[in-house]
Amino acid sequence: MTRKRILRAAVDVISEKGFKSASMREIARRAEVGDATIYNYFPTKESLLYGYCEEKQREVAEALKKIDDFNEYTLREQLQQLTETELALWLPDREFLAEVFTLTFSAPVAGAVNLAETRRLFNHMVEEMIDAAIEVGEIPDQPYRELLAPLYWDYFTGVLAFWLKDDSQGYANTTQLVDRSVEMIAMVLQTALIGKALDLFSFMFRSQISRHLEKLSDYTAPWKQAKRRFMDGGDG
């Protein structure tokens, strides 16, 4: 498939030369397509970079679907399998992923926009796991459920950043981090602690805002009174 061939060539060239030094022409030549063809699929180098991230999420989803008894895994096991599968599939392209991180964090706003589809695909997998766990009563219904998958995305981004800097043999430190942190996340979900904490913060925030608005009203009352007298006393 032409699209996948272009993406594979982009990964190879960017990994070898870095994002800034890689050229669309060289990627097209490596993919054995014409210069016009590559622009039909990917108008910019950035779209190539982030397009591969999207493709990687589709590969992860397919890999999980091929596990026959995946639906029988506990939520903790599913989240751990997701995280480990991501790392395993990114391993051959670790240098490329480092380029993704460099570009994304050098321009965070643009990076967030460019990663939107990748993030959506990842979050969808997490949402499926959480929803299934709630349906069978493995975990209680979660307040602010829509925030859980984005929070796991943020967590996983941190795992990737840690992994890219991990120089332990076989990335053993990353393995330990994932084992311990996923266990903690599963425990938090079983107690619906995130929702309860957000409820508490929401209550405290509303209370503080209410108090400050009352004080603000006291401060602004004289101004409003003075302004009314001024408006009422003009010649017009």
Sequence positions of predicted segments:
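Soluble, non-transmembrane catalytic domains of enzymes that act on hydrophobic metabolites at membranes
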Residues: 4, 8, 50, 101, ...
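Helix-turn-helix
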Residues: 5, 13-47, 51
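Short amphipathic alpha-helical elements of helix-turn-helix/winged-helix folds
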Residues: 9-13, 89
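Hydrophobic alpha-helical connector segments
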Residues: 51, 65-99, 106-109, 113-121
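Short, basic, alpha-helical segments at the C-terminal edge of helix-turn-helix-like DNA-binding modules
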Residues: 54-60
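Acidic/His metal-coordination segments adjacent to aromatic residues that form catalytic metal sites
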Residues: 71-72, 132-141
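Amphipathic alpha-helical packing segments from all-alpha helical-bundle domains
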Residues: 111-136, 146-158, 182-187
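C-terminal peripheral helix-coil segments that are non-catalytic and often amphipathic
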Residues: 165-236
